[in-house]
Amino acid sequence: MAEAQNIPAGSTTAGSIAVAAESTVATRMSAPPSFDVADFPVPHGREEEWRFTPLERLRGLHDGTAAVTGEGVRVEVEAPEGVTVETVGRDDARLGKAGTPVDRIAAQAYSSFEKASVVTVAKEAVLTEPIRIAVHGQGGVAFGHQVIELGAFAEAVVVIDHTGDAVLASNVEYVLGDGAKLTVVSVQDWDEKAVHVAQHNALVGRDASFKSVVVTFGGDVVRLHPRIAYAAPGGEAELFGLYFTDAGQHQEHRLFVDHNTPHCKSNVAYKGALQGQDAHAVWIGDVLIQAAAEGTDTYELNRNLVLTDGARVDSVPNLEIETGEIAGAGHASATGRFDDEQLFYLMSRGIPQAEARRLVVRGFFAELVQQIGLPDVEERLIAKIEAELEASV
């Protein structure tokens, strides 16, 4: 059996391509996927999937001591005609279709929520306005569950907006019927003390297209785990993300794309900027191409821009291949400091230093902001980036 090839890419960045390697995505998990929280040991920080996460700042989400208190979050759904919005109990058969919890917090969330929101777009419905889901924290502890399901050949855009203060653990499911097209923009714009841990599962149908744009700015600790699986051949998934990690913040994005069926595609691109003492960003990109997934075409990329001293990035792409019959596979990861030469060039053209810094950072994020496709959201994010940079001057 071949050994994994390790490809170092900087002091805080590493990657590997494993061809039939002994260490796989499955063996790096502390327990098999399960809906039962009792099947997962309490993490202590030495486990592979928890080694970057500051457990002491999770406010008890990881060890079962976090209990629902008062008003945790308020969820409001604004949906155009052709969309059904329901509040259901945990026995609803539509829950759990897209995937199973893979860690203790996700299982705790699944075991603890009282009501779930189910948003359904009828087959062949093509929405001209986005579905907007507002999740507003009200200072308490909450466990949530949401399902967005598209029928065959339906098309929709969903914006999930997280604001306020909360300690929230949740599961979000995306179920795409054959030929469906779904774009999801998930914005984490929490207050500075918020804690948010979530698992996002997408099940992509035959010839369906799923695009996810994850945007993370606020919060004390934010840990998101998007996961993709394919229900049939021909599915495509695009996972884009941008994050701006400020002093003292911990932002962690852990992705897993499971190419479990033939002739599917995936494209991952995440970019982050960091500034301030003890700003910490973590990006884990796991892509598994199973033996049955012939014809797979996949690529993942992570780029990080460190704006000040005292910030840290951990970036780990992993690509595991169990068949040689693929269309293409690759990954790239790089972390670098602010380009002084580029800054000098702009300043030599008469642009003030502060404005030059803004131009460079805006250019760094531009291609991902444009993936959103909603002018009001794009303008808001550009304004947030500007505000972050103003605070650092």
Give short role names for the model-derived ranges.
Residues A2-K115, V126-L127, I131, Y270, ...:
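N-terminal amphipathic, basic helical "cap/leader" segment at the start of enzyme domains
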Residues A4, G96-I351, V361, F365, ...:
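Conserved beta-strand/loop scaffold segments within soluble protein domains that form the structured core
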Residues W50, L359-V360:
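Residue-level "edge-of-site" marker
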Residues R28-A31, D39-P41, Y299-E300, D340, ...:
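Generic hydrophobic-segment detector
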